[in-house]
Each structure stands twice: as structure tokens, then as C-alpha cells.
Amino acid sequence: MIIDGKRIAEEIQLEIKELIQQSLCRPPCLAVLIVGSHPASQIYVNRKTAACKAVGIASIKCELPFTISEEELIREVEKLNVDPQIDGILVQLPLPPHINSNRVNYHIDPQKDVDGFHPLNVGKMLIGELDGFLPCTPFGIKTLLERTGIEVCGKHALIIGRSNIVGKPMAALLMQSYPGGNATVTVAHRYTKNLKELCLQADLIIVAIGQPKLITADMVKEGVIIVDVGINKIHDSSKKNGYQIVGDVDFVNVAPKCAFITPVPGGVGPMTIAMLLYNTLLSYSKSQNLNL
């Protein structure tokens, strides 16, 4: 079965829109800081602000020059921290090489950290306090599995990739002792020598490594569940733009062996944006003392 992440994300966005319409206060507001004119970043930010508008969340796009210093960027973040009209702050990655993204994230108010990357929120997640802000992509995957009715308890989950954005927090969520967790988790990375062996053992594979069609049909068992987080451009002369977007899984050949699989595009990507909207609503509801 192909999991339609776009449909599930639309359901979540409709729920968020209805909750916002019930509120008598000001609309929630998300501030997005983007440094430089990286084309992909501009596309991602525009998608996020469009999604905000669709559900009734106000958004502010703060465009800053590529040459901005780390200290200047931190000052911009701190201005937003103390602005009572701002509920969520997101610093669009990647940042220029002269800026330490971790240090910038440390300066975001944890109560406005809707990306879920502040050390306080990461720490709360690690000790099982899941009522705060969870990183949007792992949160989206968790929600996708739950809404599809997939039980991960007792399953062997293999996470391929150990980034701070996807791999590490995903492992933390799946191993937690709560409904939707309790998996036996293995994390693979570039130095893992027996990847095929691990894949064949896994009941659930979540791959986020940025390598097109890394996972092939001979690497997975029948009935596996696969969540493909990869987004890769590959040359395709049959396409008008000369390329196609693929994931980290050889979808055409792997899908027939899967009990469930997410497509690329239309799988995890829409869920990431939906959970950003959810986190913004959560921050807003806390600041306004609302029980939404």
C-alpha cells in the first residue's frame, strides 16, 4: 500500500484551520528567517508561508543578506523572541558556512522553537516528555504511521541516516515507551558495513541519507514498511525540466514487496509542513492559555 502523505497532511491542516477559526484571539504567527537567496530555500519558505495562509496562520518572512554575521543573525532572532505577536520562529537551513546553525538555534526561545531543534526541546524528547515541540520531519513520520494504523511496538526499526534533523530524533521517538513507540531501533550511517543484512532484518525502514535509489529490491524482505525521506534530483531527458525527483528508495522495484511505502514526492514532505503548522498552533495556544 502506498501511503498518501499529501492526503493525511491535508486532513491535519483542515483540523488546524478549524481550531484557529474557533479561537477569538489574534491568529497565530510564524516568523521565518532566510539568509541569502538559495533557490531551494526560497521554494521551501514559500511553501511554508503558503501553507500558513491556507490555515489562517499569519507569517512574516525575514529576508537577510548572505553576508550577515552570526551575531547579527542572533540579534534578529532575539528581537523575535521578545515580540509577543510572534508565536513561532524558524531559521531556514542551510545557513552560509560562516554561521553556526546550532549556535543560532540555541538562541531561539524554546517556547517559540517550532522546528524543535533547541537543546531544551531535544532533551525533553530524549527523556520521553513529548508534550513540547518535536522536530517536524520525525513528528510527521510518527503521525503518518499512527494515522495509517501502523503499529511499531516490538518491530525492528532501521533508521538509515543520523542527522540531527531526521535520524537522531527519529530514533529517540521510536524507542520511547509510549503508544507509537517501543520499537527496537538500529541506526545505520555511512560507516555501516552490513547495510543489506540490516535491511533484510528490518520490519520498518526509515531512510534519510540523500542518495538516490540506495535501497533496492534485493535489500528488503516481503511485507516491510518503508518511509522514504530522501529528496534527490536525477537527470531525466523525458521530463520537460530535464530531471525527476526521486527518493532514497528504488520505488518502482521495491514497492511491490512492501506492506506500506511512502512515495517521493507526496509522502513525508507534506507531513513536515503540516507538523510545523501544528507546532505553531501549539505555541500560540500556550501563549494565549487556550485549550485547543
Curated annotation (Swiss-Prot):
Single GO MF annotation: methenyltetrahydrofolate cyclohydrolase activity
EC numbers on record: 1.5.1.5, 3.5.4.9
Keyword NADP: yes
Binding site for NADP(+): G161, R162, S163, I231
Superkingdom of origin: Bacteria
Protein's job: Catalyzes the oxidation of 5,10-methylenetetrahydrofolate to 5,10-methenyltetrahydrofolate and then the hydrolysis of 5,10-methenyltetrahydrofolate to 10-formyltetrahydrofolate.
Name used for this protein in its record: Bifunctional protein FolD
Organism: Protochlamydia amoebophila (strain UWE25)
Gene name per UniProt: folD
